[in-house]
Amino acid sequence: MMNISVIGCSFVGLLNRLRLLKLHPGVRFFIDASAGSGNRAIAAAVLHHLAQVKPDAIVVLWSGINRIDVPMPADWHNAYGAEVSFRKIQDQYWYHSGGFSCGGFYPPTPKILIDYFKSQHLGGTPEYFTDVSMLDIIGTLAILKTQNIPYYSNFIYDVHADYSEYADILFDKPLEHTLGKISPKSHYCSLFPWDQLDTQNTPFEWAKNQNLLDTDQFHPTSDAMHAWFEQFVIPKLDIQPPSNV
């Protein structure tokens, strides 16, 4: 049985494990999705899977450049935490500033975290957010490259595009905290391994061009996400047919 870990934000949550199993007998998919997750928490989840799950292949979909994650210990979470906008990894609770729904900026997220997220976004620059995301992504991709296992890596959207006007049309408010654009002024741009990402085939742009976005006009439909996954991800994973076929 081949084990494949699929890690990311709410886009990954659109994939159904049983549906994938029917299409790919002999493959066990571990779907690790956390709505609103930023790239720091996604990086932590990838390392957790490498160390604990030990998959035969990994799929990682990076999320918004401008999203912020902060880890909190279990005792703090049990005393003050909320059952929203976080990803649990071992004894760490990674709280997210939020994605499409901006969950981390409002109750029941604890006020101390709301204030922290707001201070980050009020004071942050495009270079700051790019640096923070790139640090985690560069390090994680470097580790993946050394593991000698197949992997697929991409962003959920085109990080070189400016979606501020698109967000204004949908919600009459900017979504820069949700998405964000890579700043070419980042200290780490020259180190970023673009050749390790399939950035020409991001799921948001693919679904948008195919007119397969869900009613929120941000997420692909579940069927669209599965179609994108089969077309662009599966061929990169060197999946072997079951031994009894």
What residues fall within each predicted segment?
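Serine-esterase "nucleophile elbow" of acetyl-processing enzymes
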Residues: 1-52, 221-227
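Alpha-helical cap/lid subdomain in secreted, periplasmic
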Residues: 47-245
